[in-house]
């Protein structure tokens, strides 16, 4: 038989034995269950599935509503200096590190560290705590966007006028274009805009503080339920379904962003808005807060230290060149952030010109941009209903794929702890439904009349930059100084066929830990207690609760170290050495002999063991 025919036979053979059986989770093989082995792990159907899933996961709301405002606030074009320093010194190296760890170990965010360095398994648990808390409150934004989308299907947008039941006598419509003198004469009085009253009085029904939760907002609760149902059905069949959903959710927002960009650039006042966005103020670089904002924005926008990128990477084939795609995805992420600034600030410049105010008076970040500034802007445009629908569909899709990718990362990490149980039959689907239900019930605390205060508390503390910097530091330390960056480069070379440039391992060993440490220290030094809308001050007990949320993830790293040392027998130095030794060589050689390419580090009883046969995989 010719060599080509032999290779085709091997491909057909392995394609058949990896085919899912009816009624089983994807990747479950009958022989695995018969022999009591963990079911076969799923793999991405194609390269584009992985690329779009990662793109959808980390190109999200922060790119559209956070980066442009930070750039404007922190010196315009000058902000790009610390941004790119953190990008190449921290963001890209940690992003690639997490993806390649998942690919190298074929494990999720927790069990990958059990293989790499058991003493640092707390890194995985810290990531899961962060992403679990993030999944509770991030989806609330999508519930708000869903509500606004439904409200947009009206001939007259409900936040355009002051003639509704929720409006107060202080509500003042934008009459600037018709009567500039009327606006000027009333600008000093205590008036509010209809869009602000719609947001605070209709959507949120905002109470006076966090200690007055008030009644449940059933309209928002139903929107939240609908978003959770969509999220569940996007991931319930694993990466095979997720990889297909992102073909729409990850690409359509870019098309709509392009439409909004073109529309914004054609509005009067757009040039002034872009000037405010990019005009460099080098003196702002003397402020440590600028560097803190740059560092935290990088870690937020790249969705690192959450376990999600590790989980997505774990579904790659071993010989997949993820380094190439990680670099391209990094360009896509930062490029989207930069271009979004033109789309947003061109419209804010138009608003400022129409109202006759400085752009600083209309520039907003976060929910203020999405649910106050932009809705107000569309009321000033022709065809306001069309632009409102377009914007909130984009917002919903940007957040939706980020949400279900983060949930997928959480599920993958937890399922990998008990694969024999949770990958069998429909156990995985039931487990996903349980996680979604529990998270939905916890999220109901944020759709009450005082829910906005709870949301801000979670947003400020639970997944704060301090937590992400803490996890990133230990990730780099464990790989560079415990496992060994050169050893890890050997594994990367075995996977992708060449060694990446040395800047990656230098970043893991020195640059990234230094950046994380400096940013971590300055974040604590510059810490300011949380306030809402710069007016409401949170009570002491709420601040304490916020710090408990932050520490709940950070404490995992030292706590797991202590537990592992206590559970291991022998003298302290022997236990320490044992827990610092990678687990994957013996385990892969014995349990998955031949399933992984040969590695010189695979030793069993002090003898090297090569695979006995070859599994042929189709390159992505």
UniProtKB/Swiss-Prot annotation:
Catalytic reaction(s) noted: 4-aminobutanoate(out) + chloride(out) + 2 Na(+)(out) = 4-aminobutanoate(in) + chloride(in) + 2 Na(+)(in); taurine(out) + chloride(out) + 2 Na(+)(out) = taurine(in) + chloride(in) + 2 Na(+)(in); beta-alanine(out) + chloride(out) + 2 Na(+)(out) = beta-alanine(in) + chloride(in) + 2 Na(+)(in); hypotaurine(out) + chloride(out) + 2 Na(+)(out) = hypotaurine(in) + chloride(in) + 2 Na(+)(in)
Name of the featured protein: Sodium- and chloride-dependent taurine transporter
Species name: Bos taurus
Topological relation to the membrane, as annotated: Multi-pass membrane protein
Key words, A-Z: Cell membrane, Glycoprotein, Membrane, Neurotransmitter transport, Phosphoprotein, Symport, Transmembrane, Transmembrane helix, Transport
GO biological process: amino acid transport; neurotransmitter transport; sodium ion transmembrane transport; taurine transmembrane transport
Residue ranges annotated as Cytoplasmic topological domain: 1-49, 564-620
Biased composition regions of type Basic and acidic residues, renumbered to the chain: 29-42
Any one GO cellular component localisation term in the record: plasma membrane
């Amino acid at each position: 038989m010719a060599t080509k025919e032999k290779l085709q036979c091997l491909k057909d053979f392995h394609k058949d034995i990896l085919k899912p059986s009816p009624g089983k989770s994807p990747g479950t093989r009958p022989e695995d269950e018969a022999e009591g082995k963990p079911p076969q792990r799923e793999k991405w159907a194609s390269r584009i599935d992985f690329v779009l899933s990662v793109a959808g996961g980390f190109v999200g709301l922060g790119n559209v509503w956070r980066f442009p405002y930070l750039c404007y606030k922190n010196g315009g074009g000058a902000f790009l200096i610390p941004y790119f320093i953190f990008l190449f010194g921290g963001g890209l190296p940690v992003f690639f590190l997490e993806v390649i760890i998942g690919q190298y170990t074929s494990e999720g965010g927790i069990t990958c560290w059990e293989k790499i360095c058991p003493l640092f398994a707390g890194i995985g648990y810290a990531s899961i705590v962060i992403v679990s808390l993030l999944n509770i409150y991030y989806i609330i934004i999508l519930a708000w966007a869903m509500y606004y989308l439904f409200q947009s299907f009206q001939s007259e947008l409900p936040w355009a006028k002051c003639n509704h039941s929720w409006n107060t006598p202080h509500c003042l419509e934008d009459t600037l274009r018709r009567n500039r003198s009327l606006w000027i004469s009333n600008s000093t009085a205590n008036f509010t805009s209809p869009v602000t009253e719609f947001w605070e009085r209709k959507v949120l029904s905002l109470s006076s503080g966090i200690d007055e939760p008030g009644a449940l907002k059933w309209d928002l609760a139903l929107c939240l339920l609908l978003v959770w149902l969509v999220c569940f059905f996007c991931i319930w069949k694993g990466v095979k379904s997720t990889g297909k959903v992102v073909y729409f959710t990850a690409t359509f927002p870019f098309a709509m962003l392009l439409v909004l960009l073109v529309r914004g650039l054609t509005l009067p006042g757009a040039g002034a808005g872009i000037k405010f966005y990019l005009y460099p103020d080098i003196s702002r670089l003397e402020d440590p807060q600028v560097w803190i904002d740059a560092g935290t924005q990088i870690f937020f926008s790249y969705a690192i230290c959450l376990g999600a990128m590790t989980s997505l990477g774990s579904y790659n084939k071993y010989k997949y060149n993820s380094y190439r795609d990680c670099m391209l995805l990094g360009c896509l992420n930062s490029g989207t952030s930069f271009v979004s600034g033109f789309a947003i600030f061109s419209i804010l410049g138009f608003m400022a010109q129409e109202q006759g105010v400085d752009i600083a008076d209309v520039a907003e970040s976060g929910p203020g941009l999405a649910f106050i500034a932009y809705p107000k802007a569309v009321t000033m445009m022709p065809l306001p209903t069309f632009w409102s629908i377009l914007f909130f569909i984009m917002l919903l899709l940007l957040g939706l794929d980020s949400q279900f990718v983060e949930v997928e990362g959480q599920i993958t990490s937890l399922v990998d702890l008990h694969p024999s149980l949770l990958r069998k039959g429909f156990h995985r689907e039931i487990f996903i439904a349980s996680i979604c239900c529990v998270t939905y019930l916890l999220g109901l605390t944020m759709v009450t009349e005082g829910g906005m205060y709870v949301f801000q508390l979670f947003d400020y503390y639970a997944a704060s930059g301090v937590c992400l910097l803490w996890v990133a530091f230990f990730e780099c330390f464990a790989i560079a100084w415990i496992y060994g960056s050169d050893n890890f480069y050997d594994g990367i070379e075995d996977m992708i066929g060449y060694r990446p440039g040395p800047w990656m391992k230098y970043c893991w060993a020195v640059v990234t830990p230094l950046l994380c440490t400096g940013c971590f220290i300055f974040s604590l030094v510059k810490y300011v207690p949380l306030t809402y809308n710069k007016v409401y001050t949170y009570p002491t007990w709420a601040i304490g609760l916020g710090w408990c949320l932050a520490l709940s993830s950070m404490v995992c790293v030292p706590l797991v170290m202590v537990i592992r040392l206590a559970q291991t027998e022998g003298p302290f130095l022997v236990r320490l050495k044992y827990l610092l030794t990678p687990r994957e060589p013996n385990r892969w050689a014995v349990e998955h002999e031949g399933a992984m390419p040969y590695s010189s580090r695979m030793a069993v009883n002090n003898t090297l063991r090569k695979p006995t046969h070859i599994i042929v995989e189709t390159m992505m």
